Each structure stands twice: as structure tokens, then as C-alpha cells.
A protein has these predicted regions:
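Short hydrophobic/Thr-rich beta-strand motif most characteristic of the beta2 strand and flanking loop
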Residues: 27-35, 43
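Short amphipathic alpha-helix used as the core "switch/output" element in two-component signaling
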Residues: 64-76
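Receiver (REC) domain active-site loop signature in two-component systems and cognate sites
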Residues: 58
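Conserved acidic segment of CheY-like receiver
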Residues: 2-14, 18-22, 52
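Proline-centered flexible-loop/turn and helix-kink motifs
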Residues: 26-27, 49, 75
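Active-site residues of response regulator receiver
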Residues: 55, 83
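Active-site beta3 strand of CheY-like receiver
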Residues: 47-53
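Acidic catalytic/metal-coordinating carboxylates
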Residues: 36-39, 61-65
């Protein structure tokens, strides 16, 4: 079964590195990226994803606020919070 993954982090270097790692994993496909919580929430209505890797510390909406709003709309999402 293929896992469709979205990356949400304000640091493009981190998103690029994580995407590179995930693309080497069998059964994983990165289907979207967002540089902010607001950008992620805007893409949520049409998003087909199973898992979200979410940065905790972002400007604007942080990871906790974004996760709360996302799960209110899509309780089926699995969100993994990251911080560096």
C-alpha cells in the first residue's frame, strides 16, 4: 500500500532533505509540500494524503495550531510533528 505524504515546514532545505529520504522508501510518495500552516490549510480541501510531516515551530500558525485546524476538517489524517 502506498502512503501519500505531505511535508509542512518553513525551511525549504529541511523539506528537500526529508523528501529525498522519503522518496527512497518503498511505498512512500510525497504528494505535496507547504511552507506554512496557512498554505497547508489552503491546500487541504482537495488534498489526497495519508500522512503529514509537520514542523512544530513555524511563523504564523505553528504546528499545534495547524494540526488542530487540520484535524477538525480531516480527522482521518495522521500528523507527525517534527522540530529541529
Amino acid at each position: 500500500m502506498e502512503r501519500k505524504i505531505v511535508l509542512v515546514d518553513d525551511h525549504s532545505l529541511f523539506r528537500n532533505g526529508l523528501r529525498g529520504l522519503l522518496e527512497r522508501c518503498a511505498g512512500c510518495r510525497v504528494v505535496g509540500e507547504a511552507a506554512s500552516g496557512e498554505e497547508f490549510l489552503a491546500m487541504l480541501p482537495g488534498l489526497e494524503a495519508d500522512v503529514v510531516f509537520m514542523d512544530f515551530a513555524m511563523p504564523g500558525l505553528d504546528g499545534a495550531q495547524t494540526t488542530e485546524r487540520a484535524l477538525a476538517r480531516r480527522p482521518d489524517l495522521r500528523i507527525i510533528t517534527l522540530s529541529m
